[in-house]
Curated annotation (Swiss-Prot):
One of its GO terms (molecular function) is small ribosomal subunit rRNA binding. It comes from the Bacteria. Residues 104-117 have a biased composition (Basic and acidic residues). The keyword Calcium does not apply. This is Small ribosomal subunit protein bS6. SUPFAM superfamilies: Ribosomal protein S6 (SSF54995). One of its GO terms (cellular component) is cytosolic small ribosomal subunit. Binds together with bS18 to 16S ribosomal RNA. Belongs to the bacterial ribosomal protein bS6 family. InterPro entries: Ribosomal_bS6, Ribosomal_bS6_CS, Ribosomal_bS6_sf, Ribosomal_S6_plastid/chlpt, Transl_elong_EF1B/ribsomal_bS6. Residues 121-132 have a biased composition (Acidic residues).
Length: 132
């Protein structure tokens, strides 16, 4: 079986349906004896340019190992699902399992916020001790 990277963008008004879509597409892959190596829900993001007069979309990334029949079925599902505004399926040489740069950047920002919060609470505790 070959390895694929799949990205699809969902209409922002249909963001509530994304978990169900992910479940359905994941089931399609696993039922065809495929394997999901990485699944990332990037959430609602700004588009680089408007698509169908939309400026935002909900992004989902999948890295899978699956037979061609499963990929064909996924592409057909993307094509006939009105909520999916764009999709891209690329064949890659090896399975990709590490976090994508999008998730790494998000985690770094979250880590910086945690450190800032920890520093603020420590400063507040120090200030409270000196007042007594």
């Amino acid at each position: 079986m070959r390895h694929y990277e799949i990205v699809f963008m969902v209409h922002p008004d249909q963001s509530e349906q994304v978990p169900g879509m992910i479940e359905r597409y994941s089931a399609t892959i696993t039922n065809a004896a495929g394997q999901i190596h990485r699944l990332e829900d990037w959430g609602r993001r700004q588009l680089a340019y408007p698509i169908n007069k939309l400026h935002k979309a909900h992004y989902v990334l999948l890295n899978v190992e699956a037979p061609q029949e499963a990929i064909d079925e996924l592409e057909t599902n993307f094509r006939f699902n009105d909520a999916v505004i764009r999709s891209m399926v690329m064949r890659v040489k090896h399975a990709v399992t590490e976090a994508s740069p999008m998730v790494k950047a998000k985690d770094e920002r979250r880590g910086d916020r945690r450190e800032d919060f920890a520093n603020e609470t420590a400063d507040d505790a120090d200030a409270g001790d000196s007042e007594e």
